[in-house]
């Protein structure tokens, strides 16, 4: 169990009745009289802890190894490190981040089947032994650069119903798997298990069943070749928000029987997974400011009366876009929905609108068409469920900086964090509803709080 590290955040415990939305509104109010209305995030670390409790309940046999690539914010990684999760790292830099927070190498899997030789050597020097492969060339690289590695064979799956398909690029077929196991034996490289990934944003839970069945076949092949394999990695693909068609428990209700059938609890096989968006998607809300506006008139045929026959539409330009947080639209096939920071009047008219990012690229469009009341320069829009594959891949194209992140946590979750820090993760903790609970806020960058509203504390996160 990792304790909290030396990377410190000032934390403020708010009085009862304050919520994450209050923190967001407070920040907006603080900058309302300023010209610097930069985009920013509010991220609920308590939501991440609740996700972990939910995981333990829904998949009790499966140890999560958080996919750092999904969101590599230090506060996120540190919070998960404190809960005892493992970490799926894809590069030297991610390994450095995780180990820099005190995570031991046995809680890391280098889950990239195609690695640079220098980074394989770095993994060896840092004590990271578990790593994936799916080709003979990778086997030979590892044999030379890290002969003591504990290899996990990545197999291909049917990910045709996933939002982001991965098996086109990664994974060995069942036929190739036997050849690779035989080659690993010749090279005297230890293969300890099998991994797969059904694709990010999986929409068919039955895909997991077939993949687990295929993994069983490869385990049997390993036994025939002479390996004693003991690790099954079921990858990711778990939803991270409640606006998806397929719910988390719908997936786990299919996975658990498959695991019990093909890898029963007395089989001696350790089971891990690589959830990313599951942990962080719903924890992040992004606030963006309207920096420019354009009115467009769409002429209707058969009339010369502009006021009555022409349709008015609006183009809004905000201070984050597809080169920043909304890269998820291009790379993660995300569909985002703009929410209003101010509640519209009941009789307010709505107009066809589009939302654009701040860069000079015409591709920088966030929402092609939506209905909004007329808004103005200086108004704010909110986007929920923005924690997955957003900040990690954001660039500073055109000189636009990444948004600051402000962290919040409910008092019960804060108290749980303190217990973890002192005594480790308590297995008997139940999920808690934070709907009306007091909130606390940790800052990653420069947010002041009114002293009357909160008590100051310090947490090593």
UniProtKB/Swiss-Prot annotation:
Annotated GO biological process: putrescine biosynthetic process from arginine, via ornithine; regulation of protein catabolic process
Cofactor: pyridoxal 5'-phosphate
Keyword set includes Metal-binding: no
Regulation: Inhibited by antizymes (AZs) OAZ1, OAZ2 and OAZ3 in response to polyamine levels. AZs inhibit the assembly of the functional homodimer by binding to ODC monomers. Additionally, OAZ1 targets ODC monomers for ubiquitin-independent proteolytic destruction by the 26S proteasome.
Enzyme Commission number(s): 4.1.1.17
GO function term, MF aspect, one: protein homodimerization activity
Signal peptide: none
Transmembrane spans: none
UniProt xrefs under PANTHER family: ARGININE/DIAMINOPIMELATE/ORNITHINE DECARBOXYLASE, ORNITHINE DECARBOXYLASE
UniProt-recorded name of the protein: Ornithine decarboxylase
Upper taxonomic lineage: Eukaryota, Metazoa, Chordata, Craniata, Vertebrata
Gene name in the database record: Odc1
